Structures are given as structure tokens and as C-alpha cells.
Amino acid sequence: MEGEKNWIVVPTWRIPGRLEKWHSLVKYLKHRTKELQQVSYVPHHKVGWAWWTCSRVIFPLKEEAYLEVQGYWNLTPERGFLSSYAVRLTWYKRSFYTDVTPDVADQLLHGSYFSCFTANEVRRAIRGEKILSYCNYPSAHEGQVPSLQFLALRVIQEGKDGSQGESATRKQRRRNNRRSIRLARKNNNRAQQGSSQPLAPRTHFPGLAEVLGILA
């Protein structure tokens, strides 16, 4: 008698293409800039029995918690193993785990990775001094109710005066985002060859949804 099929259903976020850009960016930030040095990247050939998993990226967080971005492929075997891709975002601590949305995942990551404004920046701004720290993960603050201090620092960082639209600072940050991703895609061979070039500047991380190309 044929045994019953057991199905495991998990929430996933569909993406339009392959995951090379995501993998390259993780390796770039892990090995090149060292900003994700503690992150574990597990490629598909080391995953083991889960043949539908193309990668696992595990971010250690505070208080012994973890955020895992698990990439899936070949999700439509009944249609001939089409090249369909998706990701699953999971937060877990010891024996408890839960799936999270991309915006929550960004907030969790920003609590441990990519620098933000320090507590002294408000006093520096009031005294008219130069701001020494900036938020390199702006998308992690979306969906939150920001404080007036944070909004003021964001205005200073972005260089907006309320009438002239985008400043060179915001445009530069967008260029930095594109540059980080572009360098990540070309960095794999260079890193393997032991390049002696200096480390890249601190990265402005555009957020998981943008990097992965998550489709809402």
C-alpha cells in the first residue's frame, strides 16, 4: 500500500530571477569589507539533503538569536523543474522560530549590522558641528515612527532643504548602493586571487527586498 505524502508548507517570497546578485553581495561584504564577517554563507552543494535549497545565509543577532535567508529553487517540479526562485526569511532563537517579513528582517539586521547614528550626533548637530556617523541602512527604519532627532539627522545626512529636491548627498548614497552591488558581482574572482587593493568604504545597504528583488 502506497504511503501517504506529507507536505510541509512554509511562507516564501517570490523573486523574479536568480540569486547570484544576493550571493555575490554577501560574499563581498563578508570577505572584502568585513561588514558581514560573522555571517555564515552555505552554498547549495553544502546544504545536504534539502535539494530544493540553493543557499542559506545565517546572520547571528544579539542575545543568541539568528536571522536566516534561505533561497529556494526548482519550486515547480510538477511543471518540469522550471527556474522559479523564492526566499524564506526566518528568525529563530534556540528551539523557537518564526517567519518574518522583509521589513521586519531589515529592522532585525540593522540592530546588529551596518552603522547608524550615534547618541552624540544630536548634540553635535545642535552645536553646528560636523556629523561623524551616518545611517547606512535607511530602509530598516521604514514602517517605524521616527523620533524628531532621527528625522533631523536624516535631513542633515540627505542634505535636503525642503525646496530643491534631492541633493548630491542622497544621489551619492544611491550611487554607493549601486556601486556596492556592482562590485559584489565582480568581486568573487578578485577575492580568490588575494587582491592587495584597500578595503572598500562602508556600505550603504539598500535592504533585503531591493537586493533580492522580492515581489510583493
Swiss-Prot record:
Q: Name one GO cellular component term.
A: host cell plasma membrane
Cite the InterPro entries for this sequence.
Vif (IPR000475)
Q: How is it modified after translation?
A: Highly phosphorylated on serine and threonine residues.
Q: Annotated motif BC-box-like motif: location in the chain? A: 147-156
Compartments annotated for it: namely: Host cytoplasm; Host cell membrane; Virion
Induction note: Expressed late during infection in a Rev-dependent manner.
UniProt membrane topology term: Peripheral membrane protein
Residues that the record marks as modified (Phosphoserine) are: S147
Q: Where is this region: Multimerization?
A: 154-168
A matching Pfam family: Vif
Has UniProt tagged this entry with the keyword Ubl conjugation?
Answer: yes
Q: Provide the family line.
A: Belongs to the primate lentivirus group Vif protein family.
> How the protein assembles, per its UniProt entry?
Homomultimer; in vitro and presumably in vivo. Interacts with viral Pr55Gag precursor and human APOBEC3G. The interaction between Vif and APOBEC3G is species-specific, which may play a role in restricting the replication of HIV to humans. Forms an E3 ligase complex by interacting with human CUL5 and elongin BC complex (ELOB and ELOC).
Any extra remark in the record? Required for replication in 'nonpermissive' cells, including primary T-cells, macrophages and certain T-cell lines, but is dispensable for replication in 'permissive' cell lines, such as 293T cells. In nonpermissive cells, Vif-defective viruses can produce virions, but they fail to complete reverse transcription and cannot successfully infect new cells.
Q: What does this protein do?
A: Counteracts the innate antiviral activity of APOBEC3G. Forms a complex with host APOBEC3G thus preventing the entry of this lethally hypermutating enzyme into progeny virions. Functions as an adapter molecule, recruiting APOBEC3G to the ubiquitin-proteasome machinery. Targets APOBEC3G for degradation through the assembly with elongin BC complex, CUL5 and RBX1. Binds viral RNA and affects the stability of viral nucleoprotein core. May play a role in viral morphology.
Q: Which protein, by its recorded name, is this? A: Virion infectivity factor
Species:
Human immunodeficiency virus type 2 subtype B (isolate UC1) (HIV-2)
